[in-house]
Amino acid sequence: MSEVLRSFGLAVRIFRERQGWSQAQLAQNSGIDRAYISRIESGGVDPGLEMQRRLANALGISHTELIAQAEEEEQRRRRRPDRSGDQPA
């Protein structure tokens, strides 16, 4: 699983939880299947641009805000030491 996809999924979850929504509520508001949202949030699927825009629109944010949050999460992941305690290269 790609770290970028995991970071994007985490960004979706962060914004969803800020709304106080369950995955089912996001699914209803976006028209995207709940199981697919679960896969997005876990980093198990690469949502295309249209899907990203639908998620952002449902969450009441811009696509740019969603991507910026994903990039921030990716930077946090890179700064964290790995399990052995070494800093990432």
What is the predicted function of each stretch?
Residues 2, 65-89:
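Short, charged recognition helix plus adjacent turn
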Residues 6, 17-18, 46:
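Short amphipathic helical patch at the helix-1/turn junction of helix-turn-helix
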Residues 10-29, 54, 80-88:
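Short basic helix-loop element that most often maps to the first helix and adjoining turn
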Residues 12, 26-27, 37-40, 66:
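Conserved hydrophobic/aromatic packing and binding residues within compact polymer-binding modules
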Residues 31-45:
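Recognition helix of helix-turn-helix/homeodomain-like DNA-binding domains
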Residues 41, 51, 70:
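DNA major-groove recognition helix of helix-turn-helix
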Residues 50-65:
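DNA major-groove recognition helix of helix-turn-helix/homeodomain DNA-binding modules
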